[in-house]
């Protein structure tokens, strides 16, 4: 099995804080709030629900905004310091299914009802993607080193099982761009079409969209035939009902975490790196703009103001010799975007950094792949 590591990939920018419970009343149900908070108690048919998430989300601000907190051992929660807006609020947690969304505004005490999952399969739909990804079974250690496509199907460069796993998970491989184990990747959606086998379905899906050529080429690092068989076996076992192990709910200080999210780049973009301060002195740029680069998907620096919730962009100038690296045509249409060329860029930017004066620096180069 693949070892599980906790990580987050997405278009949202997350800022994480810790709350302390010092000085709070320990009476069950007593949740003091300010005028910009929402708080209350989460219960289900089994009683108070500890260690579950309460999510508040709004589209009223210039960019989509969400705040997430965790209930304490008596099911109490506090969503602090919310911008003025109307929020959809619901409960999510291991062993539950999402509760119906309730509309509320800051300054309100709001008790919520959690919904117990009817069965293990329903509960598992909310488990982290990497728990599902851990069900993927890599080639056994005895199959290494690989003997090539004409041998055991594994590349000769894969000297050990860990080399093979590394090639799947590291730079320019699957998990650099994809959250393997999420619902779309752990299933074969009907939108892909009808195929004679799961191997054929995976061979097709890895060629779709603007990066289809790159994905299918990367498959060679895993052994094309064996790689397809391994991914097909993974989704087949999940389709047959195999479930990952049950993750633990947040415990102890994990319940003090407050996550704030802004969708700051758009559904077609891929924000690769971001910076908000000088790492040598994290007091620099307090509450100031947050800067992100869109790497392969655009030629600009994306900037979020966390106070106004507004997003702006600054173009990154390419060199005079740079060419647009977007393909002229999509070989296999994307399930989501069809034949649309969603990425066009001349610059590949990485690793923005902030200096002691709040200036942003980044590495960059001309896009390396040129399509005539």
Where are these regions (language model features)?
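Beta-strand-rich domain onsets/edges
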Residues: 18-37, 41-47
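Short, ordered, surface-exposed loop/turn motifs in non-cytosolic proteins
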Residues: 36-38, 44-60, 64, 84, ...
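Short Pro-Gly-centered beta-turn/loop motif in secreted/extracellular proteins
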Residues: 48-49, 78-86, 94
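A short, solvent-exposed loop/turn motif at the edges and junctions
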Residues: 58-64, 86, 90-107
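Short, acidic Ser/Thr/Gly-rich low-complexity loop/linker segments typical of extracellular
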Residues: 59-78
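Beta-propeller fold detector
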Residues: 205, 247-262, 311-334
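Signature of short aromatic-glycine-proline-rich micro-motifs recurring in repeat-based ectodomains
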Residues: 223-233, 265-281, 285-287, 298, ...
């Amino acid at each position: 099995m693949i070892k599980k590591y906790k990580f987050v990939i997405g278009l949202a920018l997350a800022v994480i804080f810790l709350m302390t419970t010092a000085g709070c009343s320990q009476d069950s149900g007593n949740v003091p709030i300010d005028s910009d908070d929402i708080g209350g108690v989460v219960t289900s048919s089994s009683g108070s629900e500890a260690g579950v998430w309460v999510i508040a989300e709004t589209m009223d601000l210039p960019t989509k905004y969400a705040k997430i907190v965790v209930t304490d051992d008596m099911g109490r929660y506090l969503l602090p310091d919310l911008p003025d807006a109307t929020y959809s609020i619901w409960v999510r947690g291991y062993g539950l299914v999402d509760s119906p969304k309730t509309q509320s505004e800051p300054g309100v005490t709001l008790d919520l009802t959690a919904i117990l999952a009817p069965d293990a399969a329903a509960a598992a739909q909310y488990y982290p993607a990497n728990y599902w990804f851990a069900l993927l079974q890599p080639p056994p250690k005895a199959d290494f080193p690989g003997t090539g496509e004409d041998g055991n199907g594994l590349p000769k460069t894969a000297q050990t099982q860990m080399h093979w796993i590394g090639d799947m998970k590291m730079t320019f491989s699957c998990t650099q761009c994809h959250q393997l184990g999420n619902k779309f990747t752990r299933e074969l959606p009907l939108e892909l079409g009808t195929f004679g086998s799961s191997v054929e379905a995976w061979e097709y899906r890895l060629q779709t969209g603007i990066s289809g050529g790159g994905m299918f080429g990367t498959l060679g690092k895993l052994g094309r035939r064996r790689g397809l068989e391994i991914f097909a076996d993974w989704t087949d076992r999940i389709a047959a009902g195999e479930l990952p192990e049950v993750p633990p709910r947040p415990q102890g200080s994990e319940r003090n975490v407050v996550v704030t999210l802004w969708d700051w780049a758009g559904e077609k973009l891929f924000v690769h790196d971001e910076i908000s301060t000088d790492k040598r002195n994290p007091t620099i740029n307090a509450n100031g703009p947050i800067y992100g680069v869109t790497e392969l998907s655009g030629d600009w620096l994306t900037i979020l103001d966390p106070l106004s919730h507004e997003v702006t962009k600054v173009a990154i100038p390419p060199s005079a010799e740079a060419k647009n690296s977007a393909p002229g045509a999509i070989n296999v249409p994307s399930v989501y975007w069809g034949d649309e060329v969603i990425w066009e860029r001349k610059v590949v930017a990485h690793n923005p950094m902030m200096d002691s004066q709040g200036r942003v620096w980044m590495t960059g180069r001309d896009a390396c792949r040129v399509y005539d």
